Structure formats: structure tokens, C-alpha cells
Amino acid sequence: SISCGESCAMISFCFTEVIGCSCKNKVCYLN
């Protein structure tokens, strides 16, 4: 997986979801 450069440790949500990223292991990754 490619890291989207966004953390989701505090909230289990990625603002980068709009470009196809999702939260995995407290980091946002591109699927």
C-alpha cells in the first residue's frame, strides 16, 4: 500500500478518502 501522508490515530477518518485513501493501522493508505 502507498501511504497518503495522513495519520488517522486520533480519529479513524481520512480526509484523503476523497482520493481513495483509507485508514489502516493509524495511517491513511491508498487502496
Swiss-Prot record:
The protein's PTM annotation reads: This is a cyclic peptide.
**Keyword line:** Antiviral defense, Disulfide bond, Knottin, Plant defense
Top-rank lineage group of the source organism = Eukaryota
**Homology family:** Belongs to the cyclotide family. Bracelet subfamily.
What exactly does this protein do? Probably participates in a plant defense mechanism. Has anti-human immunodeficiency virus activity.
What is said about the domains? The presence of a 'disulfide through disulfide knot' structurally defines this protein as a knottin.
The name this protein carries in UniProt is: Leaf cyclotide 1
Species whose genome carries this gene: Viola hederacea
